[in-house]
């Protein structure tokens, strides 16, 4: 796209408009300034609320993918890419899943997590190539993230995923974007102009983070990665998480600390297995068999 055409396109985007509520921010005190930002941030959850039907639809597709051996893959550039990588990286310790189940890809690679990479987002072929590098397939779900809804890198990835017959989801902060025209499911969190004109790391980025939280949390809950609202598949990889695992077992079973610690030791720090052992009054092998029979869903295993 020529510079003139790009300027015209940007001028039409809500995310590039000037916010009338922040025209004088360079004249405000610190307290007045953060009040303006806070007031604008209040619009974010309301914008996300309008997209709940589309978010739920995406969750159902992600659950289907997980159940059929597929993955959830996020792709984006800049802030959008970083948020995808962040959400993906939280899944293994929180839900005990392998890191390849939820994948975050950012334009420019790992260096782009900390440093801007010139022109990384402008290449549609690079988006396709980065998906090919992780062996993206029809079984996977691709979530393309870009506040503008027009990032070439993300568009290239969405087009490639669509050509394979994979489920495609777009997350943007401008309605009827180019990405939305490609994606099977379009999540348009229209949060309005930013406090700092064009700085989509602010409200748009916050909206993206809320949506990503929902996508992974709801999907993991639906495949049995929690019991009630407890993270029973948490990986006890440090002292804080080991203490949390003990607390989870105690709360789920109403046992005392000694029972929780002893059972966790037998269960090799597997909180879900320890809970199954205590509530079903079974040994480790039997508890493992019961959980396996019910695909790791603790509540179903206990009922049956």
Swiss-Prot record:
It comes from Actinobacillus pleuropneumoniae serotype 5b (strain L20). Pathway: Amino-sugar metabolism; 1,6-anhydro-N-acetylmuramate degradation; Amino-sugar metabolism; N-acetylmuramate degradation; Cell wall biogenesis; peptidoglycan recycling. This is N-acetylmuramic acid 6-phosphate etherase. Specifically catalyzes the cleavage of the D-lactyl ether substituent of MurNAc 6-phosphate, producing GlcNAc 6-phosphate and D-lactate. Together with AnmK, is also required for the utilization of anhydro-N-acetylmuramic acid (anhMurNAc) either imported from the medium or derived from its own cell wall murein, and thus plays a role in cell wall recycling. The active site is at residues 90, 121. Homodimer. One of its GO terms (molecular function) is ether hydrolase activity. PANTHER family: GLUCOKINASE REGULATORY PROTEIN (PTHR10088:SF4). Keywords: Carbohydrate metabolism, Lyase. A lyase-type mechanism (elimination/hydration) is suggested for the cleavage of the lactyl ether bond of MurNAc 6-phosphate, with the formation of an alpha,beta-unsaturated aldehyde intermediate with (E)-stereochemistry, followed by the syn addition of water to give product. It comes from the Bacteria. It catalyses: N-acetyl-D-muramate 6-phosphate + H2O = N-acetyl-D-glucosamine 6-phosphate + (R)-lactate. Its EC number is 4.2.1.126. Belongs to the GCKR-like family. MurNAc-6-P etherase subfamily. Residues 62-225 form the SIS domain.
